[in-house]
Regions:
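Non-catalytic protein-protein interaction segments used by genome-maintenance enzymes to assemble
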Residues: 1-48
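Metal-dependent nuclease catalytic regions and adjoining charged, substrate-binding loops involved
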Residues: 32, 40-43, 50-179
């Protein structure tokens, strides 16, 4: 079962069904408004490929693609918006599905290995601790050797289990999550 949320789905007179994904960026370029690396970051992109896969599951061959509805957020430029059209061949979506299943299997294998390890937990990727504004768990890693051995909450952190099936109320549809 694949769970997610599409920002918007439209029926276009010329293009049929189009999935709209709203995005904002501060990646500014004087010449065009949007930096070229931002424009190209959507292809390939696992999130977008997943939405397109879901779109084809829901609407079949009526889906013509995804349009990234990009808005530039900048201190002096307030009028830069752009649609970035994205499409994939079915073979590319098949590869996305294979790779996604591979990542799921890797995570399950890592969890099994972590459960058996005397050190507990997953292996850390310490080269990424400061990327994207920094990891939210950096302080725990700095001061606690084996977080998995601790039952109590860490100061400043809240334990919250993400349960999308509860949010979607699948029991009302008489569906159950896959085991």
């Amino acid at each position: 079962m694949y769970v997610g949320r599409l920002d918007k789905v439209i029926k276009h007179k010329q293009y049929g069904i189009v999935i709209i994904e709203h995005k904002s960026t501060s990646a500014y370029a004087k010449a065009s408004g949007f930096r070229s690396d931002y424009i190209s970051s959507w292809s390939p992109n696992s999130q977008i490929d997943g939405y397109l896969h879901a779109g084809h599951m829901l609407f079949g061959d009526k889906v013509s693609g995804i349009w990234i509805d990009a808005a530039l957020v900048h201190k002096t430029v307030h009028n830069k918006f752009r649609f970035i059209p994205i499409d994939r061949q079915f073979e590319q979506l098949d590869v996305w599905l294979h790779e996604t299943r591979d990542w799921i299997q890797r995570i399950e294998d890592e969890k099994s290995q972590a459960d058996r390890s005397p050190y507990g937990g997953y292996a850390k990727n310490t080269g990424s601790c400061n990327m994207y504004g920094g990891c939210a768990y950096r302080d725990i890693c700095k001061f606690v050797a084996k977080p998995s051995d601790r039952e109590a909450d860490f100061s400043g952190y809240r334990v919250s289990k993400w349960e999308p099936f509860s949010i979607l109320k699948l029991e009302q549809l008489k569906l159950e999550p896959e085991k």
